[in-house]
Amino acid sequence: MKKFYDRKNELTALEQIEKNSLNSANFTVITGRRRIGKTELLKNYIKNKRSCYLFTTRSSEALLCEQWQKSLADDIGLKIFGKITTLSYLFEQIMQYSKQEHFVLVIDEFQDLQTINPSFFSQMQNLWDSNKGDSKINLIVCGSVYSMMKKIFEDEKEPLFGRATGKINLTPFSPSVCKEILGDYNPGYTNEDLLCLYMLSGGVAKYISLLMESGSTTKEKMIEYVTGITSPFLIDGKDVLISEMGKDYGVYFSILALISRGLTAQNEIDSVIQKNTGAYLVNLDKVYSVIKPIRPLYSKSESRNARWQITDSYLRFYFRFIYSNQSLVELGQYDLLKSVILRDYETFTGKTLEQYFTNKINEEKQLTKIGGWWDRKGENEIDIIAVNDLEKTCSVYEIKRQANRINLSKLTEKVNNFKSIVKLEIDGYFIQTFGLSLEDM
Protein backbone atom coordinates (compact mmCIF):
# COMPACT_ATOMS: atom_id res chain seq x y z
CA MET A 1 0.00 0.00 0.00
CA LYS A 2 1.44 3.35 -1.05
CA LYS A 3 -0.12 5.21 1.89
CA PHE A 4 1.09 4.60 5.45
CA TYR A 5 -1.91 3.89 7.68
CA ASP A 6 -2.41 4.49 11.40
CA ARG A 7 0.25 3.43 13.96
CA LYS A 8 -0.12 6.84 15.63
CA ASN A 9 0.36 5.45 19.15
CA GLU A 10 3.42 3.46 18.14
CA LEU A 11 5.01 6.41 16.32
CA THR A 12 4.34 8.66 19.32
CA ALA A 13 6.02 6.12 21.60
CA LEU A 14 9.00 5.82 19.25
CA GLU A 15 9.40 9.61 19.12
CA GLN A 16 9.48 9.74 22.92
CA ILE A 17 12.11 7.00 22.92
CA GLU A 18 14.12 9.07 20.41
CA LYS A 19 14.08 12.05 22.81
CA ASN A 20 15.15 9.83 25.70
CA SER A 21 18.04 8.41 23.69
CA LEU A 22 19.57 11.87 23.24
CA ASN A 23 20.69 11.59 26.87
CA SER A 24 20.97 7.86 27.50
CA ALA A 25 21.09 4.57 25.61
CA ASN A 26 17.73 3.05 24.73
CA PHE A 27 17.09 -0.57 23.70
CA THR A 28 13.59 -1.11 22.29
CA VAL A 29 12.07 -4.42 21.22
CA ILE A 30 9.28 -4.51 18.61
CA THR A 31 7.26 -7.73 18.48
CA GLY A 32 4.19 -8.93 16.60
CA ARG A 33 3.15 -11.75 14.28
CA ARG A 34 4.60 -12.08 10.80
CA ARG A 35 3.09 -9.75 8.17
CA ILE A 36 1.81 -7.32 10.83
CA GLY A 37 3.86 -4.38 9.51
CA LYS A 38 6.85 -4.11 11.87
CA THR A 39 9.37 -3.39 9.11
CA GLU A 40 7.12 -0.82 7.42
CA LEU A 41 6.56 0.95 10.75
CA LEU A 42 10.29 1.19 11.44
CA LYS A 43 11.21 2.28 7.91
CA ASN A 44 8.56 5.00 8.11
CA TYR A 45 9.86 6.07 11.52
CA ILE A 46 13.54 6.38 10.54
CA LYS A 47 13.16 7.89 7.05
CA ASN A 48 14.03 11.44 8.17
CA LYS A 49 16.42 10.52 10.97
CA ARG A 50 20.11 9.80 11.17
CA SER A 51 19.74 6.07 11.13
CA CYS A 52 20.89 2.71 9.85
CA TYR A 53 18.63 -0.24 9.05
CA LEU A 54 20.33 -3.64 9.28
CA PHE A 55 18.61 -6.79 8.02
CA THR A 56 19.79 -10.15 9.33
CA THR A 57 20.37 -12.44 6.36
CA ARG A 58 20.90 -16.13 7.04
CA SER A 59 24.50 -16.10 5.87
CA SER A 60 27.84 -16.70 7.53
CA GLU A 61 28.88 -14.40 10.37
CA ALA A 62 31.76 -12.98 8.33
CA LEU A 63 29.56 -12.20 5.31
CA LEU A 64 26.87 -10.59 7.49
CA CYS A 65 29.51 -8.42 9.18
CA GLU A 66 30.77 -7.33 5.76
CA GLN A 67 27.25 -6.31 4.69
CA TRP A 68 26.55 -4.48 7.94
CA GLN A 69 29.95 -2.77 8.00
CA LYS A 70 29.20 -1.19 4.61
CA SER A 71 25.68 -0.10 5.66
CA LEU A 72 26.99 1.50 8.86
CA ALA A 73 29.63 3.44 6.92
CA ASP A 74 27.19 4.60 4.23
CA ASP A 75 24.28 5.50 6.51
CA ILE A 76 25.75 6.95 9.72
CA GLY A 77 29.42 7.47 8.87
CA LEU A 78 30.79 4.71 11.09
CA LYS A 79 33.99 3.85 9.22
CA ILE A 80 35.87 0.88 10.61
CA PHE A 81 39.23 0.12 9.06
CA GLY A 82 39.97 -3.46 8.18
CA LYS A 83 37.65 -6.39 7.59
CA ILE A 84 35.41 -7.31 10.51
CA THR A 85 34.46 -10.98 10.79
CA THR A 86 32.71 -11.19 14.19
CA LEU A 87 29.42 -9.68 15.34
CA SER A 88 30.79 -9.02 18.82
CA TYR A 89 33.61 -6.80 17.52
CA LEU A 90 31.21 -4.99 15.17
CA PHE A 91 28.75 -4.32 18.01
CA GLU A 92 31.62 -3.11 20.20
CA GLN A 93 32.53 -0.55 17.52
CA ILE A 94 28.88 0.53 17.27
CA MET A 95 28.68 1.10 21.02
CA GLN A 96 31.96 3.04 21.05
CA TYR A 97 30.75 5.23 18.17
CA SER A 98 27.47 5.93 19.99
CA LYS A 99 29.39 7.59 22.83
CA GLN A 100 30.23 10.48 20.48
CA GLU A 101 27.36 10.31 17.99
CA HIS A 102 23.60 9.93 18.37
CA PHE A 103 21.78 7.72 15.85
CA VAL A 104 18.99 5.19 15.44
CA LEU A 105 20.06 1.61 14.73
CA VAL A 106 17.41 -0.89 13.63
CA ILE A 107 18.21 -4.61 13.50
CA ASP A 108 15.51 -6.63 11.71
CA GLU A 109 15.06 -10.42 12.08
CA PHE A 110 17.07 -10.10 15.27
CA GLN A 111 16.29 -13.65 16.43
CA ASP A 112 18.28 -15.10 13.51
CA LEU A 113 21.53 -13.82 15.04
CA GLN A 114 21.27 -16.68 17.51
CA THR A 115 21.49 -19.16 14.63
CA ILE A 116 24.42 -17.35 13.03
CA ASN A 117 26.39 -17.18 16.30
CA PRO A 118 24.82 -18.91 19.35
CA SER A 119 27.14 -17.04 21.74
CA PHE A 120 26.47 -13.55 20.35
CA PHE A 121 23.62 -12.62 22.70
CA SER A 122 25.87 -13.28 25.72
CA GLN A 123 28.58 -11.15 24.12
CA MET A 124 26.04 -8.46 23.30
CA GLN A 125 24.80 -8.43 26.91
CA ASN A 126 28.32 -7.81 28.19
CA LEU A 127 29.02 -5.07 25.64
CA TRP A 128 25.68 -3.36 26.32
CA ASP A 129 26.14 -3.44 30.09
CA SER A 130 29.71 -2.13 29.80
CA ASN A 131 28.98 0.76 27.43
CA LYS A 132 25.37 1.87 27.86
CA GLY A 133 26.21 4.39 30.59
CA ASP A 134 28.03 6.69 28.16
CA SER A 135 26.08 5.80 25.02
CA LYS A 136 23.43 7.81 23.15
CA ILE A 137 22.27 5.02 20.87
CA ASN A 138 18.63 4.45 20.00
CA LEU A 139 18.77 0.71 19.37
CA ILE A 140 15.60 -0.93 18.04
CA VAL A 141 15.34 -4.64 17.29
CA CYS A 142 12.46 -6.59 15.79
CA GLY A 143 11.83 -10.10 14.54
CA SER A 144 9.12 -12.11 12.82
CA VAL A 145 9.40 -15.30 14.90
CA TYR A 146 7.29 -14.16 17.83
CA SER A 147 7.99 -17.12 20.12
CA MET A 148 11.77 -16.70 19.77
CA MET A 149 11.68 -12.93 20.31
CA LYS A 150 9.58 -13.49 23.41
CA LYS A 151 12.02 -16.09 24.75
CA ILE A 152 15.10 -13.94 24.04
CA PHE A 153 13.82 -10.98 26.05
CA GLU A 154 11.34 -12.46 28.55
CA ASP A 155 12.99 -15.71 29.66
CA GLU A 156 15.04 -14.92 32.76
CA LYS A 157 17.58 -17.59 31.77
CA GLU A 158 18.44 -15.72 28.56
CA PRO A 159 21.37 -13.23 28.54
CA LEU A 160 19.30 -10.33 27.16
CA PHE A 161 16.55 -10.72 29.75
CA GLY A 162 15.91 -7.36 31.41
CA ARG A 163 18.06 -5.41 28.94
CA ALA A 164 15.22 -3.88 26.91
CA THR A 165 14.30 -0.38 28.05
CA GLY A 166 11.03 -0.49 26.12
CA LYS A 167 8.76 -2.95 24.31
CA ILE A 168 6.11 -2.38 21.67
CA ASN A 169 3.84 -5.22 20.55
CA LEU A 170 2.34 -4.43 17.17
CA THR A 171 -1.28 -5.56 16.83
CA PRO A 172 -3.59 -5.74 13.78
CA PHE A 173 -5.31 -2.65 12.41
CA SER A 174 -8.54 -1.71 14.19
CA PRO A 175 -11.92 -1.99 12.42
CA SER A 176 -11.93 1.77 11.73
CA VAL A 177 -8.57 1.58 9.94
CA CYS A 178 -9.74 -1.43 7.91
CA LYS A 179 -12.75 0.63 6.85
CA GLU A 180 -10.51 3.57 5.94
CA ILE A 181 -8.25 1.40 3.77
CA LEU A 182 -11.11 -0.36 1.98
CA GLY A 183 -12.81 3.00 1.43
CA ASP A 184 -9.66 4.40 -0.20
CA TYR A 185 -9.50 1.50 -2.67
CA ASN A 186 -13.25 1.01 -3.15
CA PRO A 187 -15.35 4.04 -2.09
CA GLY A 188 -18.55 2.14 -2.88
CA TYR A 189 -17.78 -0.93 -0.79
CA THR A 190 -20.57 -2.84 0.93
CA ASN A 191 -20.50 -4.13 4.49
CA GLU A 192 -20.30 -7.65 3.06
CA ASP A 193 -17.05 -6.58 1.38
CA LEU A 194 -15.78 -5.22 4.70
CA LEU A 195 -16.69 -8.43 6.54
CA CYS A 196 -14.89 -10.53 3.93
CA LEU A 197 -11.79 -8.34 4.23
CA TYR A 198 -11.87 -8.79 8.01
CA MET A 199 -12.37 -12.55 7.69
CA LEU A 200 -9.30 -12.86 5.45
CA SER A 201 -7.01 -10.34 7.13
CA GLY A 202 -8.18 -9.64 10.67
CA GLY A 203 -6.46 -6.29 10.21
CA VAL A 204 -3.02 -7.74 9.36
CA ALA A 205 -1.32 -5.18 7.12
CA LYS A 206 0.29 -7.54 4.59
CA TYR A 207 -2.92 -9.44 3.86
CA ILE A 208 -4.87 -6.21 3.38
CA SER A 209 -2.12 -4.93 1.09
CA LEU A 210 -2.14 -8.09 -1.03
CA LEU A 211 -5.90 -7.84 -1.53
CA MET A 212 -6.04 -4.10 -2.20
CA GLU A 213 -3.03 -3.97 -4.55
CA SER A 214 -4.45 -6.86 -6.59
CA GLY A 215 -7.74 -4.97 -7.04
CA SER A 216 -9.60 -7.46 -4.83
CA THR A 217 -11.87 -4.93 -3.13
CA THR A 218 -15.22 -6.77 -3.19
CA LYS A 219 -16.23 -10.04 -1.56
CA GLU A 220 -16.39 -11.81 -4.91
CA LYS A 221 -12.97 -10.58 -6.04
CA MET A 222 -11.38 -11.36 -2.67
CA ILE A 223 -12.59 -14.98 -2.69
CA GLU A 224 -11.50 -15.28 -6.34
CA TYR A 225 -8.02 -13.97 -5.51
CA VAL A 226 -7.58 -16.08 -2.38
CA THR A 227 -8.40 -19.30 -4.27
CA GLY A 228 -6.25 -18.46 -7.30
CA ILE A 229 -3.35 -20.68 -8.35
CA THR A 230 -0.73 -18.08 -7.34
CA SER A 231 -2.46 -16.94 -4.13
CA PRO A 232 -0.15 -16.53 -1.11
CA PHE A 233 -3.21 -17.11 1.10
CA LEU A 234 -3.03 -20.81 0.17
CA ILE A 235 0.39 -21.29 1.78
CA ASP A 236 1.01 -18.47 4.24
CA GLY A 237 -0.70 -20.15 7.20
CA LYS A 238 1.73 -23.04 6.98
CA ASP A 239 4.72 -20.79 6.33
CA VAL A 240 3.98 -18.50 9.28
CA LEU A 241 3.53 -21.30 11.81
CA ILE A 242 6.25 -23.71 10.69
CA SER A 243 8.77 -20.92 11.25
CA GLU A 244 7.51 -20.87 14.86
CA MET A 245 6.87 -24.57 15.52
CA GLY A 246 9.48 -26.34 13.42
CA LYS A 247 9.09 -30.06 12.73
CA ASP A 248 6.55 -30.73 15.48
CA TYR A 249 3.72 -28.89 13.78
CA GLY A 250 1.54 -31.91 12.87
CA VAL A 251 -0.48 -32.26 16.09
CA TYR A 252 -0.68 -28.48 16.48
CA PHE A 253 -2.14 -28.11 12.99
CA SER A 254 -4.71 -30.86 13.65
CA ILE A 255 -5.81 -29.08 16.84
CA LEU A 256 -6.12 -25.73 15.04
CA ALA A 257 -8.18 -27.35 12.28
CA LEU A 258 -10.60 -28.76 14.87
CA ILE A 259 -10.95 -25.42 16.66
CA SER A 260 -11.63 -23.69 13.33
CA ARG A 261 -14.48 -26.15 12.74
CA GLY A 262 -16.11 -25.31 16.08
CA LEU A 263 -14.68 -28.01 18.37
CA THR A 264 -13.51 -25.57 21.02
CA ALA A 265 -13.58 -27.57 24.28
CA GLN A 266 -10.56 -29.67 25.22
CA ASN A 267 -12.62 -32.82 25.75
CA GLU A 268 -14.00 -32.46 22.20
CA ILE A 269 -10.49 -32.02 20.80
CA ASP A 270 -9.08 -34.91 22.86
CA SER A 271 -11.78 -37.29 21.62
CA VAL A 272 -10.84 -36.66 17.99
CA ILE A 273 -7.05 -36.52 18.43
CA GLN A 274 -7.22 -39.58 20.72
CA LYS A 275 -4.78 -38.17 23.27
CA ASN A 276 -4.62 -35.55 26.00
CA THR A 277 -3.94 -32.28 24.21
CA GLY A 278 -3.58 -30.10 27.32
CA ALA A 279 0.15 -29.46 26.86
CA TYR A 280 -0.32 -28.65 23.16
CA LEU A 281 -3.10 -26.18 23.94
CA VAL A 282 -0.95 -24.45 26.56
CA ASN A 283 1.91 -24.12 24.05
CA LEU A 284 -0.40 -22.76 21.35
CA ASP A 285 -1.54 -20.17 23.88
CA LYS A 286 1.52 -19.28 25.96
CA VAL A 287 4.40 -19.95 23.55
CA TYR A 288 2.96 -19.31 20.08
CA SER A 289 0.06 -16.94 20.95
CA VAL A 290 -2.14 -18.52 18.26
CA ILE A 291 -5.11 -19.40 20.50
CA LYS A 292 -6.52 -18.20 23.80
CA PRO A 293 -9.02 -19.64 26.28
CA ILE A 294 -12.33 -17.80 26.32
CA ARG A 295 -14.31 -18.06 29.54
CA PRO A 296 -17.71 -16.62 30.44
CA LEU A 297 -17.41 -13.08 31.76
CA TYR A 298 -17.10 -13.07 35.58
CA SER A 299 -16.18 -16.75 35.74
CA LYS A 300 -13.06 -17.72 37.68
CA SER A 301 -9.78 -17.93 35.77
CA GLU A 302 -9.48 -21.62 36.64
CA SER A 303 -13.03 -22.35 35.41
CA ARG A 304 -13.22 -25.44 33.20
CA ASN A 305 -16.11 -23.89 31.28
CA ALA A 306 -13.63 -22.57 28.71
CA ARG A 307 -13.59 -22.53 24.93
CA TRP A 308 -10.47 -22.23 22.83
CA GLN A 309 -10.43 -19.56 20.15
CA ILE A 310 -7.97 -18.92 17.30
CA THR A 311 -6.91 -15.32 17.85
CA ASP A 312 -5.95 -14.59 14.24
CA SER A 313 -8.71 -14.20 11.63
CA TYR A 314 -6.59 -15.31 8.68
CA LEU A 315 -5.32 -18.42 10.50
CA ARG A 316 -8.89 -19.29 11.47
CA PHE A 317 -9.85 -19.02 7.78
CA TYR A 318 -6.75 -20.94 6.68
CA PHE A 319 -7.38 -23.92 8.96
CA ARG A 320 -11.11 -24.03 8.28
CA PHE A 321 -10.91 -23.90 4.50
CA ILE A 322 -7.36 -24.30 3.15
CA TYR A 323 -5.67 -26.78 5.49
CA SER A 324 -8.84 -28.86 5.84
CA ASN A 325 -9.17 -29.02 2.04
CA GLN A 326 -5.48 -29.39 1.18
CA SER A 327 -6.24 -32.20 -1.27
CA LEU A 328 -8.22 -29.75 -3.43
CA VAL A 329 -5.22 -27.40 -3.52
CA GLU A 330 -2.83 -30.24 -4.41
CA LEU A 331 -5.15 -31.42 -7.20
CA GLY A 332 -5.48 -27.89 -8.55
CA GLN A 333 -9.24 -27.90 -7.90
CA TYR A 334 -9.37 -24.18 -7.14
CA ASP A 335 -12.93 -23.68 -8.38
CA LEU A 336 -14.12 -26.47 -6.10
CA LEU A 337 -12.26 -24.90 -3.17
CA LYS A 338 -13.97 -21.62 -3.95
CA SER A 339 -17.36 -23.40 -3.96
CA VAL A 340 -16.66 -24.91 -0.52
CA ILE A 341 -15.79 -21.48 0.89
CA LEU A 342 -18.91 -19.85 -0.58
CA ARG A 343 -21.11 -22.72 0.63
CA ASP A 344 -20.05 -22.27 4.27
CA TYR A 345 -19.31 -18.54 4.12
CA GLU A 346 -22.40 -17.22 5.93
CA THR A 347 -22.12 -19.69 8.80
CA PHE A 348 -18.38 -19.19 9.17
CA THR A 349 -18.51 -15.38 9.16
CA GLY A 350 -20.98 -15.32 12.05
CA LYS A 351 -18.04 -15.60 14.47
CA THR A 352 -16.02 -13.15 12.36
CA LEU A 353 -18.81 -10.61 12.76
CA GLU A 354 -18.79 -11.14 16.55
CA GLN A 355 -15.03 -10.56 16.67
CA TYR A 356 -15.35 -7.48 14.46
CA PHE A 357 -17.96 -5.92 16.75
CA THR A 358 -16.01 -6.89 19.89
CA ASN A 359 -13.00 -4.98 18.55
CA LYS A 360 -15.15 -2.11 17.26
CA ILE A 361 -16.91 -1.65 20.62
CA ASN A 362 -13.60 -1.85 22.46
CA GLU A 363 -12.15 0.77 20.11
CA GLU A 364 -15.05 3.20 20.46
CA LYS A 365 -16.00 2.90 24.14
CA GLN A 366 -14.20 3.22 27.46
CA LEU A 367 -14.42 -0.25 29.00
CA THR A 368 -12.98 -2.16 31.91
CA LYS A 369 -13.92 -5.56 30.51
CA ILE A 370 -15.52 -7.09 27.43
CA GLY A 371 -16.40 -10.65 26.51
CA GLY A 372 -19.17 -13.18 26.06
CA TRP A 373 -21.13 -15.26 28.53
CA TRP A 374 -22.79 -18.67 28.58
CA ASP A 375 -24.11 -20.96 31.27
CA ARG A 376 -22.76 -24.44 32.00
CA LYS A 377 -25.50 -26.16 30.03
CA GLY A 378 -24.96 -23.93 27.01
CA GLU A 379 -28.66 -23.05 26.95
CA ASN A 380 -28.17 -19.32 27.54
CA GLU A 381 -25.46 -17.55 25.57
CA ILE A 382 -24.75 -13.84 25.16
CA ASP A 383 -22.50 -12.72 22.30
CA ILE A 384 -20.94 -9.58 23.79
CA ILE A 385 -21.06 -7.91 27.20
CA ALA A 386 -19.21 -4.58 27.51
CA VAL A 387 -18.69 -3.26 31.05
CA ASN A 388 -17.49 0.02 32.54
CA ASP A 389 -17.01 -0.58 36.26
CA LEU A 390 -16.23 3.08 36.95
CA GLU A 391 -19.53 4.29 35.51
CA LYS A 392 -21.38 1.10 36.51
CA THR A 393 -22.74 0.46 33.01
CA CYS A 394 -23.20 -2.83 31.22
CA SER A 395 -24.06 -3.02 27.51
CA VAL A 396 -25.27 -6.38 26.22
CA TYR A 397 -25.27 -7.21 22.50
CA GLU A 398 -26.80 -9.83 20.26
CA ILE A 399 -24.97 -10.21 16.93
CA LYS A 400 -26.69 -11.49 13.79
CA ARG A 401 -25.86 -11.16 10.11
CA GLN A 402 -29.43 -10.07 9.37
CA ALA A 403 -31.13 -7.41 11.50
CA ASN A 404 -34.53 -9.13 11.26
CA ARG A 405 -33.13 -12.14 13.14
CA ILE A 406 -32.29 -10.12 16.26
CA ASN A 407 -34.64 -10.93 19.15
CA LEU A 408 -34.20 -8.38 21.95
CA SER A 409 -36.95 -9.86 24.13
CA LYS A 410 -35.14 -13.21 24.12
CA LEU A 411 -31.88 -11.36 24.83
CA THR A 412 -33.54 -9.75 27.86
CA GLU A 413 -34.42 -13.22 29.17
CA LYS A 414 -30.77 -14.24 28.79
CA VAL A 415 -29.69 -11.09 30.63
CA ASN A 416 -32.01 -11.96 33.53
CA ASN A 417 -30.45 -15.41 33.66
CA PHE A 418 -26.97 -13.85 33.52
CA LYS A 419 -27.85 -11.46 36.38
CA SER A 420 -29.15 -14.27 38.55
CA ILE A 421 -25.84 -16.13 38.21
CA VAL A 422 -23.27 -13.33 38.53
CA LYS A 423 -25.43 -11.48 41.11
CA LEU A 424 -23.25 -9.10 43.13
CA GLU A 425 -20.76 -8.53 40.31
CA ILE A 426 -23.15 -6.17 38.51
CA ASP A 427 -25.43 -5.14 41.35
CA GLY A 428 -26.56 -1.55 40.78
CA TYR A 429 -25.26 -1.41 37.20
CA PHE A 430 -27.27 0.27 34.44
CA ILE A 431 -27.86 -2.47 31.85
CA GLN A 432 -28.88 -1.90 28.23
CA THR A 433 -29.48 -4.39 25.43
CA PHE A 434 -28.63 -3.88 21.76
CA GLY A 435 -28.76 -5.77 18.50
CA LEU A 436 -26.03 -5.42 15.87
CA SER A 437 -25.96 -6.74 12.32
CA LEU A 438 -24.11 -6.26 9.02
CA GLU A 439 -25.93 -2.94 8.68
CA ASP A 440 -24.10 -1.57 11.75
CA MET A 441 -20.52 -2.27 10.67
Regions found by a protein language model. Name each.
Residues 1-339:
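Phosphate-binding site recognition
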Residues 304-441:
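A cross-kingdom feature that marks ATP-driven nucleic-acid transaction machinery
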